[in-house]
Amino acid sequence: MHSCPEVILTLLISGLKSRRERGRMITTILWDVDGTLLDFLAAEKAAIQSLFEEYHLGECTDEKIARYSKINRTYWERLERGELTKPEILVRRFRDFFASEGIDPDLAAEFNEKYQVCLGDTIVYCDDSLNIVKSLQGRVKQYVVSNGTVVAQTKKLRLSGIGELMDGVFLSEDLKAEKPGMEFFTQVFHAIGPVKKEEVLIVGDSLTSDIRGGNHAGIRTCWYHPEGRDDTMIQEAGVQVDEVITDLHEVYRVLEKL
């Protein structure tokens, strides 16, 4: 499948034309960034290890990274539930992490500022995402929808080349609203103009942010989960998933199907 992208794209275009004639097709994709188009864990690890070295905080082992990731994930979930603001979670996650590692928690705010910049230094594509996005240019409208910070995401999108391929970029800090909140998507749809909700597909790795947000917005949802479909996770999140993909190349199949 992956060895003949031109054939796949040709079939996709033919399928899109057929569905356009029948009045049913996906015309717009909303892409998540971290963990979907770009490997966030790789960037996270590189950024933290680099700053540990800069601040002489000792060796930053994989075990430490795992502990931080768990703390970080908990705080982002609280942001999605509206329990905390983004400025609060960005600093408090490092305060908690530093406290657990015997590091001065007062370093958290300064560390986070540098961390946001460093996050954009490491670009690792998920499943050849750059070429996938590029191949869909002119076939569907494509937009970034991300809760990531403006500093980090602007740098990532520029260095990765993904930003220039998009028809628009929507960051929660700019919108002053977070996924999965309806206000986030209301502003997105206001900006992109008239589009039928059934013609819009959101692709993302987070059930609680991307998929729940898609449910709130009344659009099609595609969960990117390399480990495969997990009905227990879906049930626990309480969301409706239209499609599950383990590789971004499967987006072609999804577009042909919907």
Which residues fall in each region the model found?
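Short glycine/proline-enriched coil/turn segments at helix->beta-strand junctions
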Residues: A99, G138-V140, I219
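Asp-based, Mg2+/Mn2+-dependent phosphohydrolase catalytic module
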Residues: S3, V7-I29, A42, K134, ...
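Short, flexible loop segments at the rims of nucleotide/cofactor-binding pockets, characterized by
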Residues: L119-I123, N147-G148, W223
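Secondary-structure boundary/capping positions in well-ordered alpha/beta enzyme cores
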Residues: G58, D104, R139-V140, V195-E198
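Catalytic-core regions built around general acid/base machinery
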Residues: D128-R139
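N-terminal helical cap/lid subdomain that shapes the substrate entry/recognition surface
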Residues: I26-D127
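Residue-level marker of alpha-helix boundaries and capping positions
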Residues: T85, I123, V144, L201-I202
